[in-house]
UniProtKB/Swiss-Prot annotation:
Tagged with keyword Ribosomal protein: yes
Organism per entry: Clostridium kluyveri (strain ATCC 8527 / DSM 555 / NBRC 12016 / NCIMB 10680 / K1)
Biased composition annotated in UniProt, kind: Basic residues: 111-130
GO function terms (MF aspect): RNA binding; structural constituent of ribosome
Cellular component terms per the entry's GO annotation: cytosolic small ribosomal subunit
Classification via InterPro entries: Ribosomal_Su5_D2-typ_SF, Ribosomal_uS9, Ribosomal_uS9_bac/plastid, Ribosomal_uS9_CS, Ribsml_uS5_D2-typ_fold_subgr
Protein name: Small ribosomal subunit protein uS9
UniProt keywords, alphabetically: Ribonucleoprotein, Ribosomal protein
Family: Belongs to the universal ribosomal protein uS9 family.
Keyword Ribonucleoprotein applies: yes
Annotated region (Disordered), positions in chain: 109-130
């Protein structure tokens, strides 16, 4: 018998997360490590769990994630986006509450490029009057 699983891809900044939802008891595995082991900060764990808590599905699915690129915050956002998309494939009725919370929207904010003549994207070199 084929195993029921739902896939979702999430992106945020430079991070890309491939998420797989499998019916289970609510374990979250990121790059073959537990969520507690992967994300040291509690706030990042909360971000990842948001779609599951919102839709009351946090004990129904095991979440298997493969994520690469970017930093911790970007990865947490990408995982949240991927979980939301996978939940949508599992149950289309969740669209309204996920959309209302903004979890289905790809955050378009990216790092601004550095310009020549400046130290960073907007930081100008120190000005000296004399």
């Amino acid at each position: 018998m084929a195993k029921v699983q739902y896939f979702g891809t999430g992106r945020r900044k430079k991070s890309i997360a491939r998420v797989r939802l499998v019916p289970g008891e609510g374990k979250i595995t990121i790059n073959k490590r537990s969520i507690e082991e992967y994300f040291g900060l509690e706030t990042l764990r909360v971000i990842v769990n948001q779609p599951l808590v919102l839709t009351s599905t946090n004990g129904k699915f095991d979440v298997l994630v493969n994520v690469h690129g970017g930093g911790f915050t970007g990865q947490a956002g990408a995982i949240r986006h991927g979980i939301s998309r996978a939940l949508l494939k599992a149950d289309e009725n969740l669209r309204l509450e996920l959309k209302k919370a903004g979890f289905l929207t790809r955050d378009p904010r990216m790092k601004e490029r550095k310009k020549y003549g400046l130290k960073k994207a907007r930081r100008a070199p120190q000005f000296s009057k004399r």
